[in-house]
Amino acid sequence: MTLRLGVIGTGAIGQEHIRRCSKVLQGAQVVAVSDINVEGAKAALARIGIDAQVFTDGYQVVKSPDVDALLVTSWDPTHEEFTLAAIAAGKPVFCEKPLAMSAEGCRRIVDAEIKFGQRLVQVGFMRPYDSGYRALKNVITQGEIGEPLMLHCAHRNPTVPESYTTDMAITNTLIHELDVLRWLTEDEYKSVQVVFPRSTSKTHGRLRDPQVVLFETRKGIRIDVEIFVNCAYGYDIQCEVVGENGIARLPEPSAVQMRKDARLSTAILTDWKDRFIAAYDVELQAFINDASAGKLNGPSAWDGYAASVAADACLKAQNSGGVEPIELPQRPAFYR
């Protein structure tokens, strides 16, 4: 059986997912897309080399009888409404992050899904599908380093545009760590503080860069995450877990080591798409398989809500400079 996909939003990530589902993955066919720029959507389909219905309205894609499942890759503020529409239509939906623009919006999606009575939502957190993170989690769950005590993490980008602001370091960048570190430790955040070291000269007036985010979890694990989005040298993701009996590090991406001109060197990636391209493939193939089987298993609406609750506390901590509580309600039995 081929899963017939409708894609809402044909911007950069939407086009990547259309290409991926049409040319790389198995078991799915993109049959409909929507975008406010119809001509741009048609041009994107032509470049990718597929034929699909093109709508101006995402709701038309949701309601189409030719569409079995949905990918929401539209403008961030529209994610909530299209995800809610998919739930109402009883169709599985893969929603790129953010699930909604606020924790309250995420909670509305959670409540709608619980009321429907079936898991229909997967959030686009790809890091749990990365082979390096999976290997690191296996080391932890197998008890090879004992109980985790501390995590030292970094999220570094070579540069960001001037439209990128201080709060986006949380909502656009740290949001990935907020999800994957919960998954990695199987723990919830208790509190957070954000501190600002000396700023790099490469930043601009609306961005304080770098930032260091300090978490305590309910089990007492201490986590520090460095966010440095103008590091200049490349795209670099680091994660070190300090356990009772040893230390485990996230493996570096595979790269050729060169001995040349009296130097030993290994290239560092500069683009996030290259760093996690395989994880995107695994993530979407899992969604296709699960949606076809009628049971989703990936990052849930509750995971999207939990990340949003933590992000809101981080934003508050950016402004207060103090330690802010992260108050996540008990996980509903529906998501256990």
Swiss-Prot record:
Residues spanning the membrane: none
Pfam families: GFO_IDH_MocA, GFO_IDH_MocA_C
Biological process, per Gene Ontology: inositol catabolic process
Record-linked InterPro entries: Gfo-Idh-MocA_inositol_DH, Gfo/Idh/MocA-like_OxRdtase_C, Gfo/Idh/MocA-like_OxRdtase_N, MI/DCI_dehydrogenase, NAD(P)-bd_dom_sf
Keyword Transferase carried by entry: no
Top-level taxon: Bacteria
Protein task: Involved in the oxidation of myo-inositol (MI) to 2-keto-myo-inositol (2KMI or 2-inosose).
UniProt name for this protein: Inositol 2-dehydrogenase
